[in-house]
């Protein structure tokens, strides 16, 4: 009889060790939604370099709280956040300007004008029930003319996320708003 309570205790402890919260993975979506058609002809190439704050450039989703930040162990980005932002921003730019291709580095094609974009996301504010926002600054250089455009702005999504998937969607919206602003800096062909 003495072993029955001990056996129950061992079962409870073992059950606690095997019970585990599942991880959820999120991605950013290019906007507007639709297919990104493969193109072989383009008038301009854009090289894109994006940095995000080291605090949020991690596998786990990070939310803003009133006293700091909260790292969510089981709400995760599918790939490093800097890679997600770079890929999504590139797709967003290409969807807005059909005459450009966004590449991680120059294609070294003589005669195809090159524009270099360096984007630094200074702060990401994401909180359930509040708008998602990014504060960013950028430098856009037309390699042919040497013209440099420098800018800084805050982009906020209109929706107020009620779930972690909504946070990812809100961040996608912020990236799309940034792309909308950046394409104005790309010279016409």
Please place each PLM-identified region on the residue numbering.
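Short secondary-structure boundary motifs at beta->alpha junctions and helix caps
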Residues: 69-76, 144-177
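Sec-dependent bacterial lipoprotein signal peptides
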Residues: 1-15
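Surface-exposed short loop/turn segments
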Residues: 18-35, 96-144, 159-161
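Mid-chain, structured segments of secreted extracytoplasmic proteins
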Residues: 70-101
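C-terminal/domain-edge helix-coil "capping" segments
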Residues: 18-29, 36-37, 159-189
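Structured segments of extracytoplasmic/periplasmic soluble domains
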Residues: 53, 87-99, 181, 185-189
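A structural "domain/chain start" motif
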Residues: 17-81, 188-189
């Amino acid at each position: 009889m003495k072993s029955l309570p001990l056996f129950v205790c061992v079962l409870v402890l073992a059950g606690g060790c095997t019970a585990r919260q599942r991880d959820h993975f999120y991605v950013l979506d290019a906007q507007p939604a639709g297919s990104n058609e493969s193109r072989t002809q383009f008038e301009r190439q854009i090289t894109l370099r994006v940095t995000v704050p080291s605090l949020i450039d991690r596998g786990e989703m990070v939310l803003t709280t009133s006293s700091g930040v909260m790292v969510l162990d089981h709400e995760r980005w599918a790939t490093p956040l800097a890679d997600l932002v770079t890929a999504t921003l590139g797709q967003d730019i290409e969807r807005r300007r059909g005459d450009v291709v966004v590449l991680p580095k120059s294609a070294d094609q003589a005669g195809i004008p090159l524009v270099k974009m360096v984007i630094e996301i200074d702060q990401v504010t994401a909180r359930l029930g509040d708008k998602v926002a990014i504060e960013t600054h950028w430098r856009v250089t037309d390699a042919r003319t040497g013209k440099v455009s420098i800018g800084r702005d805050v982009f906020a999504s209109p929706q107020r996320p009620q779930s972690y998937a909504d946070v990812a969607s809100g961040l996608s919206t912020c990236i799309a708003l940034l792309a909308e602003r950046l394409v104005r800096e790309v010279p016409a062909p």
